[in-house]
Curated annotation (Swiss-Prot):
InterPro entries per the UniProt record, alphabetical: PDC10_dimerisation_sf (IPR046409), PDCD10 (IPR009652), PDCD10_N (IPR048288)
Name under which the protein is recorded: Programmed cell death protein 10
Function: Promotes cell proliferation. Modulates apoptotic pathways. Increases mitogen-activated protein kinase activity. Important for cell migration, and for normal structure and assembly of the Golgi complex. Important for KDR/VEGFR2 signaling. Required for normal cardiovascular development. Required for normal angiogenesis, vasculogenesis and hematopoiesis during embryonic development. Promotes cell proliferation. Modulates apoptotic pathways. Increases mitogen-activated protein kinase activity and STK26 activity.
Record carries keyword Ligase: no
TM ranges: none
Species assigned in the record: Xenopus tropicalis (Western clawed frog)
GO biological process, one term: apoptotic process
GO cellular component: Golgi membrane; plasma membrane
Subcellular location, record wording: Cytoplasm; Golgi apparatus membrane; Cell membrane
Record family assignment: Belongs to the PDCD10 family.
Length: 212
């Protein structure tokens, strides 16, 4: 049975989403290791990237198995969200023009606010302010994306438009999750949705980096 285009896109999104622990958790480890043994760090990074590409979700499996073996009880989704604000070199747009650097900055700002959710969610007043800050950061990122669209022409504009639509879709989904949270109080669903939005933010940068 052949998959529809939408199903293929959804599968691709799920596949890339499960690879989030590679750059959120392992990349900082590799960066630290580079100070000790550059060659070993580069070899290990390349091996993890190759393995993750061939077996999406492998990094997450390895991390959870280590935590289980050490009997460490941790909310992996929450921890991932806390760690996901860091810049990922592979996603940063390298073009020097101000619009592209602003794109990096606005994406970074949104990710940093989202990563604070676990610390703010139990304080209603602070969390409501965080929600307002997230809404502003989303708007600022989209405005910056539109500014880049206006100023620069792209052959592969469809890919950029698609990624922008995906980002908007996940932004709305995040908003819906928040509404549900205020009814059922399930913070985990907010963490999951925030991680997805961070992932979409990285994909916007990655798409611009690829076609720019």
């Amino acid at each position: 049975m052949r998959m529809t285009m939408e199903e293929m896109k959804n599968e691709a999104e799920t596949t890339s989403m499960v690879s989030m622990p590679l750059y959120a958790v392992m990349y900082p480890v590799f960066n630290e290791l580079e100070h000790v043994n550059l060659s070993a760090a580069q070899t290990l990074r390349a091996a993890f990237i190759k393995a993750e590409k061939e077996n999406p979700g492998l990094t997450q499996d390895i991390i959870t198995k280590i935590l289980e073996k050490k009997s460490v009880e941790v909310n992996f989704t929450e921890s991932l969200l806390r760690m996901a604000a860091d810049d990922v070199e592979e996603y940063m747009v390298e073009r020097p023009e101000p619009e592209f650097q602003e794109l990096n900055e606005k994406a970074r700002a949104l990710k940093q606010i989202l990563s604070k959710i676990p610390d703010e969610i139990n304080d209603r007043v602070r969390f409501l302010q965080t929600i307002k800050d997230i809404a502003s950061a989303i708007k600022e990122l989209l405005d910056t994306v539109n500014n880049v669209f206006k100023k620069y022409q792209y052959q592969n504009r469809r890919a950029l438009e698609h990624q922008k639509k995906e980002f908007v879709k996940y932004s709305k989904s995040f908003s819906d999750t928040l509404k549900t949270y205020f009814k059922d109080g399930k913070a985990l669903n907010v963490f999951i949705s925030a991680n997805r939005l961070i992932h979409q933010t990285n994909l916007i940068l990655q798409t611009f980096k690829t076609v720019a």
